[in-house]
Amino acid sequence: MPKVHPTAIVHPTAVLSDGVEIGAYSIVEADVVIGPGTVLRDHAILRRYTTIGQNNIVDSYAVLGGLPQDLKFNPRTASHLRAGDDNVFREGVTISRATSEGEATIVGNRTYWMTAAHAGHNAVVEDDAILVNGSALAGYTVLGRGAILSANVLVHQFCWVGEGAMSQGNSATSMNIAPFTLFGGEQSCLP
């Protein structure tokens, strides 16, 4: 049976599985699905059309499934955020849903999002990836399996960071990053 704090707001169409915990002042909007054992700490928000698997932790002030930051987006569009299992979303993490009808921003399994990390619309974050404090993925980016973005790393729209790649902190890239490489600097790119 789900445990919902009396100050939390949960829309009647939201689906809460067994073992879900919703903390004080959290908000779960319409058409949200939450898998077994997932915990929303105080003040966490799951926006409409978000599906999140089992045993996830959504910490305070995280907003998952927010409207995409895309000027042409129509707020009535039924686009999605789909997150897998065993993920950790720490304080202030933001992940936007996709921009077009039926599309989704995708988060795999066992990802770790540190404070204030962000993924834009239509991003794909594969299994075991880590986003350190303040790192950001723009729209339509891909963060490969096991890749690590260090603190304050920016990945430009439509770029991908390959499997197992790791960044230097305070870096930015507007080019694709090869798998199993280290990258850093103001304009990191493939050599």
Name what the model sees in each region.
Residues 185-191:
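Short, intrinsically disordered, charge-balanced linker/junction segments flanking boundaries
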Residues 3-184:
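Structural signal for interior beta-strand "rungs" in well-ordered beta-sheet cores
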